[in-house]
C-alpha cells in the first residue's frame, strides 16, 4: 500500500470503531431509560391512592406532684393579684359569686368561685345572699380574669374544692338537697365518682384547694350541725376515684372549711371551729397510712371571727378555747418551725379589715402572743370575708400564698339586693415590702340594685 491508501484504511477503521461505540452508547442509554420507567411503574399504585397522615405524638414525661421541696423562708407577703369584679360589675356582664379561692397547676394559677347563676346587673341577683341553690356552679378562670359571661362552669356546686395532681384537675362539687346532697368527683373533665350525704345535714367541703401528693389527693368534708357535733371525714382520691375514707380523730371538736397545704410527705389543714372555739383547729393527714390527728393552733392571738380581745384570748394547743366559737369565718395559718404565720380580720367582731402577722412560738407554745411582721391587707373601714391558703412550687422551695374574699352587698349594705365579692391575692416574699390597703373599692351608689 502506498501511504495514501494506509491513511484511508486507518481512517475507515477508526470511523467504524467510533460508529460502533456510538451505537453501543445509544443502546446502553435506551436500556437504562427503559429499566428506569419499568421500575417506577412497579412502585406507583395502580389507583390514585392517598396515604393517611398520622399525627406524631410526643409524650411528655408528666409526673405527679410530690411537694417534696422545703418551705420558702419569707419575711412577709407581697401583692400578687386583684380582680376588681365588683367595680367592673357596675358596667354589667360579671357573675355574682362568693366562696372564691385560688389553686395552681404546675405552670399557671387559676381563680375559682361559686357562681349564683346570674350576673350582677340582672334581676336574678336579688336574693343571692342565700348559700345553697340548684343554680350555683363552680367557675374557673385564669387568675386575674374576672368571671365574665364566657367563664367556664366546671360543675354544679354550692360547696367545692379543687386541686391539680400534676397531670389533671380534680374538682369536688357538692350540690342537691340540704338533707341529701351529692358530692361529685370530676377528674380531667370527666365524672369519675360520687358520694351522698352521710348525716343528712348539709354535706360540705373546704371552699379552697385540696392537696395531692404522688397522685393521691385528700379533701376534708363535713356533714352535720354547723353549731354542734358533726361528722367530719377525710377522703382520699386517686384520679377521681375515692380510695379511702378516714374519720376525724384527735382533739378537734368541730371542723369546717379547712385551708390545707402540703407538708411533705403529708398534708396539714387549718380550719374553722364553728361551735366551741375561736382558736383554729389543725388536722394532720398521713398520706401513707390514712391516719388522722387533730389539735388547735397554739397561738393565743387567735384567728377566727368573732373572738375575744387579744389581751383575753387564749389557746392551749389541744382544745377549743370556748371563746365566742360561733359562728366563725374561713381562714388560714401555716407553721414555720415553732412559729406560725396567720391572717385574720382586723375587727374582732365582724368581717371587716384584714391583717397578717407572725407569732413567735405560735405553733409550739401554748398561748404565745409575741407578734411580729404585721401587715395590713385591707383597712378596717372596708369589708373582707373568707380567706384561704394555696401553695406554689418554685425552683427551690414551696411558697405559701393567700387570698382574701372582699364581700359587698347584703347583709351589710342594704341599698342593694345582691351579695357578691371580688378578691385580692398576696404571696410570700423573702424581700422587702411596703404598706397599703387593697379593699374591693366599688362605690355602692354606682352599683345596680
Swiss-Prot record:
Q: Which HAMAP family match?
A: INFV_NRAM (MF_04071)
Q: Which reaction(s) does the protein catalyse, per the Swiss-Prot or TrEMBL entry?
A: Hydrolysis of alpha-(2->3)-, alpha-(2->6)-, alpha-(2->8)- glycosidic linkages of terminal sialic acid residues in oligosaccharides, glycoproteins, glycolipids, colominic acid and synthetic substrates
Q: Name one Pfam family in it.
A: Neur
What function does this protein fulfil? Answer: Catalyzes the removal of terminal sialic acid residues from viral and cellular glycoconjugates. Cleaves off the terminal sialic acids on the glycosylated HA during virus budding to facilitate virus release. Additionally helps virus spread through the circulation by further removing sialic acids from the cell surface. These cleavages prevent self-aggregation and ensure the efficient spread of the progeny virus from cell to cell. Otherwise, infection would be limited to one round of replication.
Q: Where is this region: Disordered?
A: 305-330
Specify whether Plastid is a keyword of the entry. no
Q: Name one GO biological process term.
A: viral budding from plasma membrane
Q: Spell out the protein name for this chain.
A: Neuraminidase
The chain's Virion surface topological domains, given as residue ranges, are 30-449
The residues that the database entry marks as glycosylated are: 32, 48, 66, 123, 126, 180, 214, 382
Tell what the record comments on domains: Intact N-terminus is essential for virion morphogenesis. Possesses two apical sorting signals, one in the ectodomain, which is likely to be a glycan, and the other in the transmembrane domain. The transmembrane domain also plays a role in lipid raft association.
